[in-house]
UniProtKB/Swiss-Prot annotation:
Gene Ontology terms describing biological process: translation
Statement: the UniProt record of this protein carries the keyword rRNA-binding: yes
Stretch list, region Disordered: 45-78
Entry's Gene Ontology cellular component terms: ribonucleoprotein complex; ribosome
PANTHER family linked: 50S RIBOSOMAL PROTEIN L4, LARGE RIBOSOMAL SUBUNIT PROTEIN UL4M
One MF term in the entry's GO annotations: structural constituent of ribosome
Keywords from the UniProt entry: Ribonucleoprotein, Ribosomal protein, RNA-binding, rRNA-binding
Protein name in UniProt: Large ribosomal subunit protein uL4
Length: 207
């Protein structure tokens, strides 16, 4: 089982914690990580694109000129696709791009993402993360104590309003709960700062 240092909020090492091998110690599967990121990014797309077809464009109800005798090509509507200002043929319509990967694949992806952070030595485990009041200054101080000066994902075991509000204005820092941890967030941040309680919760779900 991989062992990592356990820190307090002052940045002091207070011991070690053993991480579950089946969650934090597997060989990262790059292909599964790729598939999971594509799935998440697809679900973020708005899908609100829309063009009008000839039935939806205003006007064009009357035949522009008679069928025969003018020497011109026959036309039925000034809103046909070949006309300027006419409708679009097979244009985009609103749709959802989201789809689901199999549950086993999704679980393997998050395990691979977490294991990659352990392999890169980019995981920081805290014994506890508590703030008496929402203060950005205090959160910055804690991150500095832990030598976390880059993009960081903070994972708590449950919703912590003070932590969330304190980190909200720090560029590159995101706070999620153990239940809300996902592949895109883990890979999109350089450091993973996770509480001991959150580790236990993640292992309980994924092990």
């Amino acid at each position: 089982m991989p062992k990592v240092a356990l820190y307090n909020q002052s940045g002091e090492t207070i011991g070690e914690i053993e991480l579950n091998d089946s969650v934090f110690g597997i060989e990262p599967n790059k292909h599964v990580l790729f598939e999971a990121v594509i799935m998440q990014r697809a679900s973020l797309r708005q899908g609100t694109h829309k063009t009008k077809n000839r039935a939806e464009v205003s006007g064009g109800g009357r035949k522009p000129w008679r069928q025969k005798g003018t020497g011109r090509a026959r036309q039925g509507s000034i809103r046909a696709p070949q006309w300027r200002g006419g409708g679009t043929v097979f244009g985009p319509v609103p749709r959802s791009y989201s789809y689901k990967l199999p549950k086993k694949v999704r679980r393997l992806a998050i395990k691979s993402a977490l294991s990659s952070k352990v392999l890169e030595n980019n995981i920081v485990v805290l014994d506890n993360l508590t703030l008496e009041a929402p203060k950005t200054k205090e959160m910055v101080k804690i991150l500095n104590n832990l030598s976390v000066d880059r993009k960081a994902l903070i994972v708590t075991d449950d919703v912590n309003e003070n932590v969330t509000l304190s980190a909200r204005n720090i560029p590159g820092v995101t706070v999620v709960t153990a239940n809300g941890i996902n592949v895109l967030d883990v890979l999109n941040h350089d450091k993973l700062v996770i509480t001991k309680a959150a580790v236990e919760k993640v292992e309980e779900v994924l092990a």
